[in-house]
From Swiss-Prot:
Transmembrane segments: none annotated. Residues 3-127 form the ApaG domain. This is Protein ApaG. It comes from Rhizobium etli (strain CIAT 652). Pfam families: DUF525 (PF04379). One of its GO terms (biological process) is error-free translesion synthesis.
Length: 130
């Protein structure tokens, strides 16, 4: 698992290889990832936007931005957690992802919360990140 903490908001990522959706002979490698966001701060926040940097083993970068996550813009009161799962296809057997969520307080303050960098490694390959 990979963790990042920004302003007492913790993001934990657990990636996993989806062998049944992958086809290495056609250069298709697919990973899922589970993310848990915990609001350990004293203020409520809403996840309004996301930014992802997805880099394959050849250094090809895909930047993804958009509102919320998986069609939602969850509000987390102090002590709340929010969990979701998603996925990422690559044309190479490994890569990495990192990014941030843009959060908004009830008072309208916007700030970024880091998503830790994490490896996307096919089974049998050495891990890129620990």
């Amino acid at each position: 698992m990979y963790r990042a903490l920004t302003r007492d908001i913790e993001v934990v990522v657990e990636p996993f290889y989806l062998e049944e959706q992958s086809d290495p002979e056609d250069d298709r490698y697919v990973w899922g990832y589970r993310i848990v966001i915990s609001n350990n701060s004293g203020v409520a926040v809403r996840l309004v936007n996301r930014y992802w940097n997805i880099t394959d083993q050849n250094g090809v970068v895909d930047e993804v931005t958009g509102p919320g996550v998986v069609g939602e813009q969850p509000r987390l009161s102090p002590g709340d957690t929010y969990e979701y799962s998603s996925g990422c296809p690559l044309d190479t057997p490994s890569g990495l992802m990192f990014g941030h969520y843009q959060m908004e307080t009830d008072e309208g303050e916007l700030f970024d919360v880091d998503i830790p960098a994490f490896s996307l490694d096919s089974p049998g390959l050495l891990r890129v990140l620990n």
